[in-house]
A protein has these predicted regions:
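Polar, enzyme-active/binding microenvironments
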Residues: 1-325
Length: 325
């Protein structure tokens, strides 16, 4: 029932409701809001690198460096405070994507003149080659784990478009045989191999707000993002009913907005302090209560590089006052 208290409880729990007799207000607690805070800067400025892991055990690797066509094979781990160099990737590349944890990650595709289909796995101490990806390889979308990943096409070598989707079992890639509905690259995806969410990206001639959901057998159109954007980088994570989509570039500007997905619709969350695109981010499946977003570029022409890291945290609860309207 509703408690009658002289003051707000010191340690309320989510869902608790009480009447504050001093302020004459009916109050309750709900799940807290998410916000971004400053983290440790990357040792190397880069954009379009891959990411994996969590806010306290993260991984960032590869990417484009200032002075195109410079690309990186550097790899760094994050402990929630600072970044530490780890063994380099075997192949330097920009626009690489990946997923997994800080000790079991997979990196896929990218550009090294021309686009490549290379797949590498990281085990916490070294990178090793795996079987090549068979689809469009630059700015593709990947989610899941090192041994059960889902990927949708990016930009194929040369010109053209493709909408194939693939799964990875820790050894090789397989074509699902079921294409997603709209060709786009530079989008973001979260979830697992049997339930994923694909949103945003660059369509031919326009920036996309479209969302598609994957149920293990087919793709279905979902609710559009509130803000259409591409050049998202490795910057979405969560599940098909609880996901996060961060930052990117609209047709005219780089944005820092965060949107949260509940399985049906998108809600605006807290903004990054530094709006940017093409950053490395946390793993693509798992909890949405914390994460990181590191590096990237902060201007619309995608030429101003930054090493900034920001950390996303959702508080356990917040107190709300009930009102009558």
């Amino acid at each position: 029932g509703i408690q009658y208290l002289a003051s707000d409880p010191t340690n309320p729990i989510t869902g608790q409701v009480w009447f504050n007799s001093t302020s004459k207000a009916l109050k309750g607690t709900t799940v807290g809001a998410g916000a971004w805070a400053s983290g440790g800067s990357l040792p190397t400025v880069a954009q379009a690198g891959g990411g994996a892991g969590t806010q306290t055990a993260g991984l960032a690797y590869g990417g484009n460096l200032p002075g195109s066509p410079a690309i990186s094979n550097k790899s760094y781990s994050y402990n929630g405070t600072s970044w530490t160099a780890t063994p380099n990737m075997n192949l330097a590349r920009g626009q690489v994507r990946g997923t997994g944890t800080a000790t079991a990650a997979v990196a896929v595709g990218g550009t090294d003149s021309p686009n490549n289909a290379d797949t590498e796995e990281y085990n916490g101490s070294s990178w090793s080659e795996s079987n090549n990806f068979s689809g469009g390889t630059a700015q593709l979308q990947v989610t899941g784990t090192q041994t059960a990943a889902l990927a949708t096409n990016g930009l194929p070598p040369g010109s053209g478009s493709a909408t194939e989707a693939y799964t990875y079992n820790g050894t090789s890639w397989s074509d699902l045989g079921t294409n997603h509905n709209t060709f786009r690259y530079g989008a973001a995806m979260f979830g697992i191999t049997t339930s994923g969410v694909l949103s945003g990206g660059q369509e031919p001639g326009s920036v996309s707000s479209k969302t598609e959901t994957w149920n293990g057998s087919s793709w279905t159109e979902g609710t559009d993002l509130n803000t259409a954007r591409a050049s998202v980088g490795n910057a979405a994570w969560g599940t098909e009913t609880d996901g996060i989509f961060v930052a990117g570039k609209t047709s005219t500007a780089v944005v820092g907005s965060t949107e949260q997905y509940n399985g049906t619709s998108w809600t605006e969350g807290g903004d990054l302090a530094t709006a940017r695109a093409n950053a490395a981010g946390t793993a693509k499946s798992g909890t949405t209560t914390s994460g990181f977003y590191a590096g990237g570029v902060s201007n619309p022409s995608l030429t101003t590089y930054t090493a900034v890291t920001e950390e996303w945290t959702v508080s356990d609860f917040e107190t709300k006052t009930f009102t009558v309207s």
